[in-house]
């Protein structure tokens, strides 16, 4: 890596500290999955009745394989950095915690299994949040690149058919993805109307 590349990475981390911490957490989660399988219970989802509220969130950091980690990290860097630079690190963290908890709870109650993980539910939440914020208040966020929303919703619907699981044995947390998207849309609508308006709105 050249000096200019190192400088660019350093500047990116400084500009997006929360995104960087979330990606670091995902890397650590992926390593723990690799070295601790079967996964220790404290990393997995636990319902509210257990009183261990942190475990409502911890599954978002668990990733199963390099592709799973890389795919989610790229999307998180792209979508999360947009929100963090526009509204700050705390705002992004609150979105991640709220939507992560919702998507994890829905996935657990839908599947009945606590053996799931990944940042994908949060990714769909951030996608929905950015999309609806731009639609309702265009001055607050730039539009998503052409075709991204269509591609991601199409991928969600394709995964829900069960083809991947039947053909490749890849289990997909469809309930987490769908509930993440919906929660992001809902929060996007809420913040579009309660946030400070710009003169160009």
Please tell me what each predicted stretch does:
Residues 2-201:
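A detector for small-residue-rich transmembrane helices and their helix-helix packing motifs
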């Amino acid at each position: 890596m050249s000096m200019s590349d190192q400088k660019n990475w350093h500047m990116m981390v400084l500009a997006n500290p929360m995104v960087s911490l979330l990606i670091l957490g995902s890397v650590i989660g992926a390593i723990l999955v690799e070295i601790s399988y079967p996964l220790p219970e404290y990393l997995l989802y636990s319902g509210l009745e257990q009183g261990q509220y942190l475990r409502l969130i911890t599954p978002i950091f668990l990733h199963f394989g390099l592709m799973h980690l890389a795919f989610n990290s790229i999307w998180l860097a792209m979508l999360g950095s947009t929100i963090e630079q526009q509204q700050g690190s705390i705002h992004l963290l609150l979105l991640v915690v709220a939507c992560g908890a919702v998507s994890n709870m829905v996935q657990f109650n839908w599947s009945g299994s606590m053996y799931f993980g990944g940042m994908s539910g949060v990714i769909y939440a951030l996608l929905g949040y950015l999309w609806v914020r731009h639609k309702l208040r265009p001055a607050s966020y730039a539009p998503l690149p052409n075709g991204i929303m269509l591609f991601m919703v199409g991928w969600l619907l394709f995964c829900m058919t069960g083809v991947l699981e039947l053909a490749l044995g890849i289990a997909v947390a469809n309930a987490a993805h769908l509930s993440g998207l919906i929660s992001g849309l809902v929060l996007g609508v809420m913040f579009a109307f309660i946030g400070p308006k710009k003169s160009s709105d």
